[in-house]
């Protein structure tokens, strides 16, 4: 299941969140520090820390808990982790599967919320591999893609501009994707 969800935050909330992250207060560091053991060798991006990043991820979490489409599709029990990720030219995240357990908690669904419009950067597509081939996803700012954590995926190299997104993992009340 790949599900695109729009309208996670209001335009005003979204604008304030992105402005706050761009203000320079968010500290970005090597994303390998947050990668699971399987993905560490293929991860080349930056992750934000600090109050602005915490505020952004808290806002997104709160909005998703009240978003009817997200709630119906994910049936969220808990958010395992949310992070602000940034890709500059030359950065990418090679083919990997997200960790099935994070801090001892099962992860069922992964999501990426785009914070940049696709025309503001080149490359940087989220590519999800499947039996029918690859699906390249590059969403407008404010849109989210929800997909099973077990999906083999990658972020294509950014060749120009900056890819900025919030990524997260959800434990559902219902483990099986077929029953969700």
Where are these regions (language model features)?
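Non-heme Fe(II)/2-oxoglutarate
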Residues: 1-76, 177-180
């Amino acid at each position: 299941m790949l599900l695109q969800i729009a309208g996670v935050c209001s335009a005003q909330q979204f604008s304030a969140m992105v402005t706050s992250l761009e203000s320079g207060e968010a500290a970005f560091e090597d994303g390998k520090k947050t990668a699971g053991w399987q993905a560490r060798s293929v991860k080349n991006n930056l992750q934000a820390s600090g109050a602005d990043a915490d505020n952004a991820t808290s806002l997104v979490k709160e909005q998703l808990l009240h978003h009817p489409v997200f709630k119906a599709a994910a049936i969220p029990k808990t958010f395992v982790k949310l992070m602000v990720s940034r890709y500059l030219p030359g950065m990418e995240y090679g083919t990997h599967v997200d960790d099935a357990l994070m801090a001892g908690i099962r992860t069922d669904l992964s999501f990426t919320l785009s914070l940049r419009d696709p025309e503001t950067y080149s490359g940087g597509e989220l590519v999800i591999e499947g039996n029918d081939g690859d699906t390249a996803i590059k969403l407008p700012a404010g849109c989210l893609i929800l997909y099973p954590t077990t999906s083999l995926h990658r972020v294509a190299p950014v060749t120009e501009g900056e890819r900025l997104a919030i990524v997260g993992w959800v434990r559902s009340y219902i483990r099986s994707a077929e029953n969700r």
